[in-house]
């Protein structure tokens, strides 16, 4: 069975994520993220949930103990979230909303972030899940998205984490979601305001949480 073999390989990899003392690293595992593009998104709701639970059971059979299961979904403006939520050993809900540099619409971005929180946060609380957000505007456009949109949301709501789209390629390609040295102040000042606010906790403030042996 191809699915069983694939799951065994995933289990073997997860087992390697440990330090020299054999302490395994915890992993938030986004099984079958719903992005509207992959093959399993074409499954019916019931078939999708059945597949999700089957993979969970297969990983349990392989004695995987260092994962926290997450349900992840990409937000599409106007669409309702959480319709495929598996409701089976889920601890984290992640919603992804990224704008590409060719379709930047800052008013829509702000409206969408508010709608995501409105839909997802009460749902997560009702199911005893933590809620995290993966987001960003490619090439940034205006750094007010950090200080005025995202920071405001972080201050008003209990959001467990905030992740941004990845930066990659040459700077001239503008495939970045967070500023880097050399970009204009227009794309930096809002980000600096956000990271310097006490509501945000970055790795440098987590001294002692994880130690390198």
Predicted regions and their residues:
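Aromatic- and acid-rich polysaccharide-binding/catalytic face
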Residues: 80-110, 165-167
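Alpha-helical scaffolding within the catalytic cores
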Residues: 12, 73-85, 110-122, 144-151
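Extracytoplasmic/secreted cell-surface and envelope-processing proteins
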Residues: 37-41, 78-81, 102-105, 140-147, ...
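Substrate-binding cleft of secreted/luminal carbohydrate-active enzymes
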Residues: 129-213
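Acidic (Asp/Glu)-rich catalytic clusters
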Residues: 14-24, 82-88, 120-126, 152-158
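Aromatic-lined carbohydrate-recognition surfaces of secreted/lumenal glycan-active proteins
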Residues: 26-33, 52-79, 128-141, 164
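The substrate-binding groove and active-site-proximal loops of carbohydrate-active enzymes
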Residues: 1-5, 41-45, 98-110, 135-140
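Substrate-binding cleft of extracellular glycoside hydrolase catalytic domains
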Residues: 1-67
